[in-house]
Amino acid sequence: MSKPQARLESVTVAAVQMTSAADVASNLQSAATLLEQAAAAGARVALLPENFSFMGRRDADKRAIAERDGSGLVQDFLSRRARELGIWIVAGTTPIADTPGERVAAACLVYDDQGGRVARYDKIHLFDVDIPGRAEKYRESANIAPGSRLGLVPTPAGLLGLSVCYDMRFPELYRPMAAAGAQWFTVPAAFTVPTGRAHWETLLRARAIENLCFVVAAAQWGQHESGRETYGDSIIVDYWGTVLARLGTGQGVILADLDLQAQRLARRDFPALSHRVM
């Protein structure tokens, strides 16, 4: 169990960009190296991308490597690295096998700096889409069971609202979290290249602006063993929609300071969240 978080004025957070493969052990080694870089650079909280531990050759492969909730290679790794590095880890998504039937949950697990798991959010909006003009078809719901609960967790950077990838297209997910006091949102993702070019930055900045929240988005990037290509462009945006940091291509880490005092003043002087009438 994590301790109550002291009120801080500015907190350094990191977003990790990866090109995950179909080998869990190799992906965890890459994640370990990048998390070490984030911690060494002063991050208090680090976000891993969606599917950080496994990008299989087929979507159905998630079922074969899914872990039971509470223990397993990936979950043990996350707890250990959070404790050893002394940082919080918001761990993209991990396939968890505790849903009815054969489908798994795409679970975003959060670990505090003592290695304790403090939150779980299951991806709600599933990507069942045919990409316009491309021979790309996605049916996440064939292998993933949707979540149904919001994810809110106190962190060193304030109250965090959890989301995953396709969730970002649904502003109604974020509004109740902002109304409940969320100060920042995380968006681990594995965006397609066409939709990334068209919408990625616009959607992230919109979610930040309309809720006066920071948004931290960690992405998959590059060519994967399935033949799929992901967009990358990990990004950190402030409550005013200003891009604080980004990594377009390649694997790596970006960092930014979340100025919570400036956010409080902005919300006081521009109280749009209190002006809602619908």
What does each model-found stretch correspond to?
Residues 1-45:
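N-terminal glycine-/serine-/threonine-rich phosphate-binding loop
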Residues 4-13, 152-161, 184:
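Beta-strand-turn-beta hairpins that frame and shape the catalytic cleft
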Residues 17-19, 49, 122, 219:
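Residue-level recognition of beta-strand->loop/alpha-helix junctions
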Residues 24, 33-114, 118-122, 191-207, ...:
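Cys-nucleophile CN-hydrolase/nitrilase-fold catalytic domain and related Cys-dependent amidase chemistry
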Residues 70-90, 159, 165-254:
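CN hydrolase (nitrilase-like) catalytic-core segments centered on the catalytic cysteine
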Residues 91-93, 106-110, 151-153, 234-236, ...:
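Short beta-strand scaffold segments in enzyme catalytic cores
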Residues 99-180, 193-202, 269-272:
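Active-site catalytic loop in hydrolytic enzyme cores
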Residues 261-278:
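A short C-terminal boundary segment appended to hydrolase-like catalytic domains
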